């Protein structure tokens, strides 16, 4: 998190002959929306192409309008500006566009066909418009021209990517960016950007990976290949082009490989419902669920129908317009009610100005049809607040966990032998809370049970139910060498009054000679099970958290057994944990 509090400014630099970047910078969190959650500040990047017929790309939003236009006029007479290219249109950017048009009414606006509809609705029919097409370059005079790639996604249905073939620059808008503010123009320290880039992708693109992959395919066909990616936010991508491009491929593939998929249907009149949808999508993604965002205003009906059948659950969001849901949402809801399975989990959310009838109507129709809701319906009046977005993420996590549990319950029942093992494991897990345990593991290169490492632990808790999981606190030096992610161990749960308790309390780690005096048998992993323990669990380390002089280990329980049917679990009575 940034602690720097410099005032907002506009950084200007030349990134290629005749191409300037104007980076409107803020070191504070620009908005409360989830995508800015890492609180690293951000830049809003605009680009000026100095040609016989100059073109300006993507002016920033309203909070930068004044300082941006002041800086822009130091580099061009606005009366000479010929084209204003908009990679996407939103209400925030429109505020700056309107001021520009007042100062330079001769400007021709360049956008996608969908963007033109928005512009005419917001500004009027009198606009000078040029609709970008993939097969038609925009001539800037001399040997300068720009090409275009359609980049429509559910979140930005009017998306447009601009290509400068002469300088080999791709003006990638929302692709390849990061919400990071700094003095570095380029990504020289690109390794330090990994987490910010991944978070940016998760928030903006994880729910629309199908469309992102299609755009990546078109970018891969560019000849010659790009020298720079010039995104809307963060550093210009120069030193990690191939790496970041492959990261986007990998992140898209990772979403497609998730076992559970949710279709997120929504329409948004003023952007508020879309903000809620984005927060829900991010929460689902963080919970390990594949999300397919469906903007009902732009998605073909056949595509909606296919998603209803292929998804494990669905969530539908709507504004309220004149006391009703928009026609596009009615269409999606109609498909769900007519073709959806009532065994699938559902969810409802929306924004409204006065009464919110559309949200109530959707909820009631789904309940009447026999659907189960995965979270309490979310109703937000006017513009969502930070608290509202937090509620969206909590609801999304609830939905994801309920969906996974529902999916698990519908799998084929195991054989009687497997059922018996599940029952034994459950009985053993029930003994874990607050107990004294001995953790044993067989180090690499060791083959005999008496060579195992063992340690007494008391900070043990059940952390998850499906799959069963536990957390264990271990000393740093022990965890760093013997409990890495993927390692397996046995947690031997001790019985109250057992001599094992005293024996292990006297020595935090047993040597080979001491283990040799105990009754042992081998678990599947090779680690020893103490035959005099009350129960045991065989576990695999799934994740770790550094907590200073200790590590907190989360492990999934693979098997276990109650070794003694009577007796109480040994409890640590002193206040400090081992």
From Swiss-Prot:
Coiled coil (residue ranges): none
Region (Zinc metallo-hydrolase): 39-233
Function summary: Mediates electron transfer from NADH to oxygen, reducing it to water. This modular protein has 3 redox cofactors, in other organisms the same activity requires 2 or 3 proteins.
Keywords in alphabetical order: Electron transport, Oxidoreductase, Transport
This protein's name: Putative diflavin flavoprotein A 2
Gene3D superfamilies for this protein: 3.40.50.360, Electron Transport, Fmn-binding Protein, Chain A (2.30.110.10), Ribonuclease Z/Hydroxyacylglutathione hydrolase-like (3.60.15.10)
Origin: domain of life: Bacteria
One Pfam family matching this protein: Flavodoxin_1
Similarity comment: In the N-terminal section; belongs to the zinc metallo-hydrolase group 3 family. In the C-terminal section; belongs to the flavodoxin reductase family.
Flavodoxin-like domain residues: 262-404
PANTHER family reported for this sequence: DIFLAVIN FLAVOPROTEIN A 2-RELATED, DIFLAVIN FLAVOPROTEIN A 4-RELATED
Entries under CDD domains matching the protein: flavodiiron_proteins_MBL-fold
Cofactor note: Binds 2 iron ions per subunit.
EC number: 1.-.-.-
